């Protein structure tokens, strides 16, 4: 049975049993700073398991993309050398959120593997946690197994947890026996399914608390079960990897080196999925993990004797619908990102080639005298890593092949010394977990109804919650207080998708004071207002579907349950619309002019400007920028209609809509259509492109490896920018005494004249230096030459000093540079062993000096400097 068929059967089986199919979440976990990558199927349901997040879903089934490189689950070093380790893999899973528990979960698992997959139950065995008597009883009833086939395990192998903290519970594992006597036990018996009975949540101290609801989390490695179904005991012999490895062997040959081909296939697949989610090679965090994967694969390509970029040539196998390695159907992001993936892989291979060759040669040099069993020093490995950029894991791979040990402690010490030097500059990742308070509020009041697409003002919004500046719930706020307000509905756009939040005001009507003292409020926060209250909305954020209005009470007061008029700043809102729609047009133009490898990496939509970050490996030329700008302005002049549609995710992508790589969308998405531009977007937009008026690019630059940034203006801001440039041009024209259209030629002439003048001035200075009355005295058989140049630049004096080649001579000159005295000291080569200029100057000035033993230049106090040098030479 093929891998794709197994996945399909699994999903359909559980859908038939009333499970909702939930699509894979991104490899980059959302709102979870505890994980670098999604490493299990349950990650996207973590907040549901803990009770933080509420859901209407009772049962779910998924095929989840997973990556295990780093942290508790790190399989990188084992890849290629074992039969079952991967960096990227798919995890099939069924989940229950307070619905069914152990008995039903075990029944589902048994039915699927014995009926859907038709596995021989005599080849199966079960493990359970040693105290889990309930699971033992259920397995006995469902499977009919004897005691020796249901094994109790007392270790943590059968008590599952995601990490040091989080949901956990006892688990039951299903094993398959290949029953081949020529296999080692580790290869013969393989775990194929893990059923986790989520009952607890583990805190940072290791304490276990009962979860609000008992849940089920199961995980079946798709590659492992495919190996069982295809009767191969090495995962890399299944249909998917066979196709990738065949393509690798087609280019590289050397079929005997199986480990190298396995590593290439595994790392290529992992890298492709990361790039498809917008991760690009870099030197930190997830970007560095991607770089490690690509570079480790490149090292094995080089080992196979293939010296040209290769990964981008193998990648198309993953999106070839006729290939057994086809993954583009289930994961269409691979197809959408084809150009970006191929460009990134090729570029990274090309950039790493010289480093790889140099590093391998240096490692050979460091290990020339080492025999198997000897140890490479940690300092040498760190020098390769830190100075030459040679990855440590590649060093370890090569040492492993040569049976040379590695001084891990020495490497760690060198690394720690480097970290100490950089620690003062470290600022952390900046990631924050979602605060519990927002979950509690949305659970109590529900989502904020956003009406800002249709309205810029609503007159009947109800105040549901008021939070103090310390995020404490309060009943009311008075003049001068900074607060956060949550309404039942709002026209204010909450900052998201790169677009900043709306600003504006709340008008709170006056209330007749309560005269009956018997019903007077017990606290001092009164909701009685003789005059209307006004709250200024300074920003709006969106957190977990709650719209948070950050306000300051300008006058009067505001109270819980008040009915307010909520008004956005309409002019500012319109400017945001212009810039957001212009960003879509810019994205469209970039892909047309530069290629469809361009994808959005980030954006800022502010009322006065826009910023767009995108993937591209080279500088955008001036001609290309002009073409991009012209295309956007042409689309503006066409006055195209901008409209939105709510569609299913699959339908939107099928119609060519652009989505942000790595972002998880719901079943229904909002698509913004502007001409041929289609993007998934929740922002506010113009009704027609003509409202944008004008588009002007002001800067283009690199912000990271493979990522460029364009900043631009629209509307009146663009007009003002053009007008300011015109005014500046006219001023320049007046200064150079030329018409505006002749400024360039006039400046060229003036620049040439300036260079000629500088040459003449320099020549005159040299003559002045030579004409100075420079004194020389003899000290202990050497000449001491000193002079103070008061009107000659230091660079001229330095050049003159370097020209002096008289033996047994010490020269000390002072000159002026930017109104400061500069000391220049030179010692002839035959005196360098006796007198160092660095030591001499440090002694007489009291400072730390650089340069070299023969020549040193530094700032100094001009008074008595020559006397001090004389004393040093005669000591």
From Swiss-Prot:
InterPro entries: aa-tRNA-synth_II/BPL/LPL, Ala-tRNA-lgiase_IIc, Ala-tRNA-ligase_IIc_anticod-bd, Ala-tRNA-synth_IIc_core, Ala-tRNA-synth_IIc_N, Ala-tRNA_ligase, Ala_tRNA_ligase_euk/bac, Thr/Ala-tRNA-synth_IIc_edit. It is an enzyme of class 6 (ligase). It comes from the Bacteria. One of its GO terms (cellular component) is cytosol. Its main location: cytoplasm. Zn(2+) binds at residues 580, 584, 681, 685. Its cofactor is Zn(2+). GO terms for biological process: alanyl-tRNA aminoacylation; negative regulation of DNA-templated transcription. PROSITE patterns: AA_TRNA_LIGASE_II_ALA (PS50860). HAMAP family: Ala_tRNA_synth_B. This is Alanine--tRNA ligase. It comes from Wolbachia sp. subsp. Brugia malayi (strain TRS). The gene is alaS.
